[in-house]
């Protein structure tokens, strides 16, 4: 593929709820643009974007994929993302380098949770937004209901560009509101036949066209005057207004069609090529501190942002990047601004699914891949200019689902750490550790499906078989009341002996660990032995009296004791403190603690009762309910015990204190 100038490059991120049809839309776009010679189908496991074995097996996207195509002289880098929240990390990576977001909506299901989270993400990333209402080959699809829901949820900036012609339950064609024509699409090629609008659809066409032009007029004062004066707004003025309105977020166009039959995809491609922004439209990029970095597409300084890493068992580490400044060329040597180390790029590729095509150069705003950058990870900046530049990193979600892992194959236990280390470079949302308490290997991910996929990748790529077992809960112990105690250590075996005597008061503490105080009078215990007493209590707290779990939240006061001029020493008072601990804690009403999480669930008003019921069934305790920023929604805050932190997808956890076990 030739090198494209910055002005002729569009980076479009496909977002939306799981199973809305993002990958099918990407396949239709690729096929119509002749980037592929067949229309891939998810049901047949032959799509360009879902090529991973697990994606084929599960019939859903797991990994984000880039798939470039050329349409009317414009290079469009289609970034296909997973729709399920377990794989949110990949979505965030693509959103970081996209210049616009296209949110795909199921024409039957309408606005779903994933639709709202996609919109919120695009807004947060300052991405221009469009909607594509999909699946109008299904008789149960309801365009007007879904469109009204989009306007209700996301505001009056949402405006129609196409609407379907519906005769009974059947879609007979589509109305282009800009050119005021009707289209009949060919499901074999994606081509369309342009016709005059049938008389029975004229009324609704005029109604929705007026809605479109009202949105267009609001982007410019001169157009507003023409609109209210009843003057015609030309097509050229409309296209420019849509372009500017999309960039500024004043217009959120809505397209419709059926991806698997390629209905509406050509008109979508036309709009992307004509009206979607190029990389330089925003003039600057953010650095890691939130400051603006000017974009210079033609300068001598080349800088790249590595947004994604893939651990390939054959190619090695694959680093996907966006050219943020200048032009990147093969065999360039750039500096990693995080490490200060030089990286030689070697060969540069553009990637379409699993296929790679070598290129010599890529212009500012384009997306490519380079292999075997050993010291580079996702969110790194590479440059031949100012080594202090650090582009704003991808903000990955916090993962909360933890499971123990065991090796299933002979010799696999020794290879688990190395295999997971490679996947950690690829997936920044997972973590791996060995528990100091249980000695259990623990893998943490966004959700159960996420962990299952990690296990499958270990097997498929590195031949490592693992199984999951429940995490051994890290219980703690504490006390609930005050108790007096005494400990005396005395040992005499000829020569110097050992003697230490302490009187202690134990009570519930306000801090997680030990709060140690002393109220010794008259020198009953010399001050130089106070640290030994404290150390003895701290060591004793490593093992509780109920089940041997560590003690937390303990206040210990040294109130008195006695000593011997010759036989007393630090070890004697340390051992005396341990004896006092063993004497006093059983009398202080000890209790077992289990971990809890504090969470907040944002949900529509209609579901708040169900959520509270589910929380109660899982031994949760509701802390309060408050209005959400979005109308018609509430925020339920609660604490949940142990594994109940996996209550719902989309739950956000904030703290992890401890609560008495039931």
Annotate each PLM feature.
Residues 1-662:
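Structural and coupling elements of P-loop NTPases
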């Amino acid at each position: 593929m030739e090198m494209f100038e910055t002005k002729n490059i569009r980076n479009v991120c496909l977002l939306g709820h799981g199973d809305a049809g993002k990958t099918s839309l990407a396949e239709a776009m690729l096929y119509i643009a002749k980037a592929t010679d067949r229309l891939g189908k998810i049901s047949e496991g032959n799509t360009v974007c879902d090529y991973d074995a697990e994606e084929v097996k599960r019939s859903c996207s797991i990994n984000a994929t880039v798939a470039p195509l050329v349409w009317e002289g414009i290079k469009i880098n289609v970034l296909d993302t997973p729709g399920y929240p377990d794989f949110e990390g990949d979505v965030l990576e693509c959103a970081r380098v996209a210049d616009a977001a296209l949110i795909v909506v199921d024409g039957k299901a309408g606005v779903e949770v994933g639709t709202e989270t996609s919109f919120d993400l695009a807004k947060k990333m300052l991405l221009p937004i469009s909607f594509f209402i999909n699946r109008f080959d299904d008789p149960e699809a309801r365009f007007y209901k879904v469109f009204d829901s989009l306007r209700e949820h996301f505001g009056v900036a949402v405006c129609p560009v196409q609407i379907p012609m519906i005769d009974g339950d059947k879609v007979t064609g589509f109305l282009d509101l800009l050119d005021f024509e009707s289209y009949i699409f060919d499901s074999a090629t994606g081509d369309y036949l342009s016709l005059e609008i049938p008389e029975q659809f004229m009324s609704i066409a005029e109604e929705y066209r007026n809605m479109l032009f009202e949105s267009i007029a609001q982007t410019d004062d001169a157009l507003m005057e023409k609109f209210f004066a009843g003057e015609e707004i030309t097509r050229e003025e409309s296209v420019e207004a849509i372009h500017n309105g999309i960039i500024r977020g004043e217009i959120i166009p809505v397209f419709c069609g059926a991806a698997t039959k390629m209905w509406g995809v050509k008109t979508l491609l036309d709009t992307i090529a004509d009206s979607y922004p190029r990389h330089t439209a925003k003039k600057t990029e953010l650095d890691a501190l939130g400051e603006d970095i000017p974009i210079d597409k033609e300068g001598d300084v080349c800088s790249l942002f590595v947004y994604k890493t893939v651990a390939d068992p054959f190619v090695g580490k694959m680093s996907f990047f966006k050219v943020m400044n200048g032009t990147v060329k093969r065999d360039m040597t750039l500096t990693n601004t995080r490490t200060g180390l030089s990286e030689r790029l070697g060969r540069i590729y553009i990637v379409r699914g699993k296929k790679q095509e070598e290129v010599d150069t890529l212009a500012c705003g384009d997306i490519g891949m380079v292999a075997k950058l050993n010291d580079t990870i996702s969110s790194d900046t590479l440059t031949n200019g100012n080594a202090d530049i650090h582009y704003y990193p991808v903000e990955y979600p916090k993962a909360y689902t933890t499971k123990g892992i065991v090796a299933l194959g002979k010799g696999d236990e020794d290879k688990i750490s190395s295999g997971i280390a490679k996947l950690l470079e690829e997936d920044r949302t997972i973590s791996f550790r060995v528990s100091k308490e249980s000695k259990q290997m623990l893998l943490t991910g966004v959700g159960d499906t996420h962990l299952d996929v990690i296990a499958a990748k270990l097997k498929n790529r590195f031949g490592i078989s693992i199984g999951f077992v429940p995490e051994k809960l890290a219980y703690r112990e504490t006390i609930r009341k005050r108790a007096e105690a005494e400990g005396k250590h005395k040992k005499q075996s000829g020569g110097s002996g050992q003697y230490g005597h302490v009187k202690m008061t134990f009570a519930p503490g306000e801090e997680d660990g030990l709060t140690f105080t002393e109220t010794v009078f008259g020198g009953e215990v010399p001050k130089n032995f106070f640290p030994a007493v404290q150390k003895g209590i701290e060591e004793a707290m490593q093992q509780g009296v109920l089940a041997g779990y560590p003690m937390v939240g303990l206040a210990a006061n040294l109130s008195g004791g006695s000593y011997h001029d010759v036989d007393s020493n630090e070890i004697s008072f340390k051992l005396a403190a341990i004896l006092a601990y063993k004497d006093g804690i059983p009398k202080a009403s000890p209790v077992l603690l289990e971990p809890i999480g504090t969470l907040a669930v944002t949900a529509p008003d209609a579901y708040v009762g169900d959520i509270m019921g589910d929380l109660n069934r899982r031994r949760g305790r509701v802390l309060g309910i408050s209005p959400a920023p979005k109308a018609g929604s509430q925020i339920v805050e609660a604490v949940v015990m142990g594994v109940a932190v996996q209550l719902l997808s989309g739950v956000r956890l904030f703290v992890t204190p401890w609560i008495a076990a039931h």
